[in-house]
């Protein structure tokens, strides 16, 4: 798709502050202006308890992170060919669907697929409560 169309994903474009703030919970501090460059949020687990209203405690903006460079510059796709694609926005997915003549699944379709077709159970493995090996 990218090679065929020249499409540039949202993570490969500099973000717009107003668009970011509109997506965050009220009271969330704005990102540092120096971070408003092409990149994406990369999960960084906290090592201590953190306030839940500030996503910067567990997500870090990484310059240059994109579907081609999952953790930023220096990271690559080699060895991840069977992993889900990351750093793809809804806009990116819609552009791909339009190009491919397809559509995104509905919420119900996505949930059915995510559960592997399993219906009427509390968890994807059945009704048994989660254990350390099933979380």
Predicted regions located by residue number:
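Functional-site microenvironments in short loops/helix caps that host divalent-cation chemistry
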Residues: 18-135
